[in-house]
Amino acid sequence: MKTFSATPADIDKKWIIIDAEGVVLGRLASIVATRLRGKHKPSFTPHMDMGDNVIVINAEKIQMTGKKREENFYWHTGHPGGIKSRTKQQILEGAHPERVVMQAVKRMLPGNRLSRQQMTNLRIYAGAEHPHEAQSPEVLDVKSMNKKNTRS
């Protein structure tokens, strides 16, 4: 029997919605990264974009363990002396709290062209509203998967 290798006609993308309220950031990011890559499917093919479209809501209510809210995110503007930093707490309280989840998922994917393509299938919203009701997404309950996924 030959090893199965998927073709574009074999790929079936679903829409999945995940509520991030009270869920630990790293555990959520690893589940989302697995879904984006398509590794949960038995027909997984490493060089194809087989993953589902994932919608994450309530990104501003994400939880972190320990003192991770005080850890810094660093970036460089490209200009001399342009190193910038902000704590995760400042980002979550700012205008774009979904960037914390976006960065965590991005860093759990391999750094290649395919993962950049797969990141376009991820949509993150700070609040509970999202414009994807027409796609009728399935609810994936991350909280009930494992008791360690939540933090009170």
Swiss-Prot record:
CDD domains: Ribosomal_L13 (cd00392). Pfam families: Ribosomal_L13. GO terms for cellular component: cytosolic large ribosomal subunit. GO terms for biological process: negative regulation of translation; translation. InterPro entries: Ribosomal_uL13, Ribosomal_uL13_bac-type, Ribosomal_uL13_CS, Ribosomal_uL13_sf. One of its GO terms (molecular function) is structural constituent of ribosome. Keywords: Ribonucleoprotein, Ribosomal protein. Residues 129-152 are annotated as: Disordered. Coiled coil: none annotated. It comes from the Bacteria. SUPFAM superfamilies: Ribosomal protein L13. Belongs to the universal ribosomal protein uL13 family. HAMAP family: Ribosomal_uL13. This protein is one of the early assembly proteins of the 50S ribosomal subunit, although it is not seen to bind rRNA by itself. It is important during the early stages of 50S assembly. Part of the 50S ribosomal subunit. This is Large ribosomal subunit protein uL13.
